[in-house]
Amino acid sequence: MKLSHAPHMGASGSFRERLSAMSTKPILLASAALLATAALTACGGQQTASRDNVRAVGSSTVLPFAKAVAEQLAKSNPGIPAPIVESTGTGAGMKLFCAGVGVQHPDIENASRRMKKSEFEDCVKNGVKDIVEIQVGLDGIAFAEANGGPGMDLTPTDIYKALAKNPFGKPQTAKTWKDVNPALSDEPILVYGPPSTSGTRDALKELILAKGCESDPAMKALKDSDKPKYEANCTEVREDGAYVDSGENDNLIVQKLEANPKAIGVFGFSYLESNADKIKGLKVSGIVPTYASISDFSYPGARPLYIYVKKAHLEAIKGLKEFVAEWAKSWGKDGLLAKAGMVVAPDAVQATSLTAATDFTTLDGASLK
C-alpha cells in the first residue's frame, strides 16, 4: 500500500484559516436541506424518509476514534444526536456503504486501508457516484504479546513463512517459530488476528506478507505474470489453526494474549498503546511499533486511516457536515484524536484532508488500485 504524502495547500488559504472557517461557515437554508431529503428519499424508494442520526460503518481500528469524535460532536452541538458508529470491518463496511444512496444506507465508511478500485466500481454501479475521501491520521499493524512473552524480533519474511498458506508455493509445514527461522523461539506458532473482512487483514497481507514473499525473486515476478498464483502463494493465510481469526473485536485479542503469553496478536497500534500495562509490541525488522516509528514510516506496518463520505447525503442527513467538520477539528497534533492514541498525519496530508472536508472534493476512481 502506498502511503500518501499530499502537497501543501496553495493560494486557497492557510491550514489554520481553513480550519477556523469551518466553525463559522453559515448553515444552508432549511429549504435546501428539505429538497435534498426529498431527493434522497426518492433514491431510497419505499424506505423510511428520514433518519435522526448520522450512521458510520467499517473498521474496528478506526472505531474508537470515530466514537470519540461522535461524542465530541454531541457534546458541542446539543441539537445534533450522536452519530451511530458500527464496527463491521473495512471490507464489510465498504459493501454496506456502496450498496446505494438513501437513508437506509450508511453515510460514512471508516477504513483502515484505502478504498479498492473494485469497491469504487461497486459504489458507482449502485448509484454511489460522489464519494469524498479523507485521510484522518496514521496507524500501524502491531504484532504484540503478553509482557511476559519471549520478545522475538521478526522480519516480514519470518511472518510470511509462519502465516502463509503456501509459503513460496509449497505446502505449509512450520509448527514452531524455530521451523521458520532457527534463530527464533521453539514455541508453537499461534497468532490471533483479524478476519478476512478487516482492513487490518488486508494491510497485513499487503504490507507484511507480500513483502516477505517478494524476498524470493520468482514469487515477485508472479505479481505481473500470474496475479492469481501470486495471491495464492503470497497473501493467502493458513487455515490449520496456527492463525486464529478473532473477529472484529481487538480487545478480545488482548485478552487472549494475557491468557497465553506464548501467543502473538495482530491489531492496530492504538490497541497496543492503550493496553501497554498488559502487552508489548514485537520488533519487525528491528523496529518497535511506536508513535515516532509510525509517524516517520520507518516501521514496516505503518498505514493511513480514512473516512469515506457519501456526498449525496450531506444536505439530507442532519449532522453529517458537522460530523465531518468535527473530524477536521480533531486530527491535529494537540487534538482529540492524538490524545486518543491516533498517530497524527504530516502537515501536508492534514492540509489536503482539510480541503476535502471543507470543499467535499470527490474521489477519482482512476487513482485507486
For each of these PLM feature ranges, what is it?
Residues S4-M9, S14-A30:
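Bacterial N-terminal signal peptides that target proteins for export
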